[in-house]
């Protein structure tokens, strides 16, 4: 373990532990007995992280294969319903999600990748069906909603969004930053260490959200006026929120033609305006 300006940092980090929808690793747990293996997650990122696979529908005992399920009703509080049998699974999934989220909270996760469009795991824009009219893409999977409510600081993304280079880079950056924050807190946070952590991440914060960087700096400066626990909790929430803001690359103007060199002037020459005007010849009387 090393110390930089009071900031505790490990020499070699253990593999980062992330939760993931099990089907994305190739596990045949989908309703049709298939999977949605994602090569980047399973092969590329998988070499550097420890995955914790979860399939809430299988853990609920729905079996493989199983009857399709979907969200219905109010997007803010949808019901989870089996399509053919019309079995209402809302309460059962809510109980499972709460229990599973508590288990995951004890596993020291630093990120989570969810399956897009899933009625249980979708992070956003999940179809919510209604009695009349087309389905609306305004829902969140029941398990995903509970997970994000229980672990609000946890970096969470969907595999579909991770195909975008900028979103992928942002997620990985947030995962590593959150891991550093959790490590700093676990090592024992003090006011000097909080100040050192902020100093080490100030440039990163400023690139994402200059306003948040200033607010966090003020929070650190005034940390002695309040309880350390409250200061650490508020800083952690602000730190994670600031990194969710996308960095907008600065557009550089194309270089124009070089300016012409300034005319060299003799050191003895005087400005034309300072030269005396020539005398006019006097006329004869």
Predicted regions mapped to residue ranges:
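N-terminal beta-loop-helix "entrance" segment that forms/cooperates
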Residues: 59-74
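Helix-loop elements that line ligand-binding/catalytic pockets
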Residues: 182-256
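Short catalytic helix/loop segments, enriched in acidic residues and glycine
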Residues: 34-52
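Short, positively charged and aromatic/hydrophobic N-terminal segments
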Residues: 7-9
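Short Gly/Thr/Asp-enriched flexible loops that form oxyanion-binding sites at enzyme active sites
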Residues: 117-147
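Short N-terminal binding/cap micro-motifs at the start of the first secondary-structure element
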Residues: 25-33
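Divalent-metal-activated hydrolytic enzyme cores
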Residues: 77, 81-99, 103, 135-210
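Short, hydrophobic/glycine-enriched beta-strand segments
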Residues: 17-24
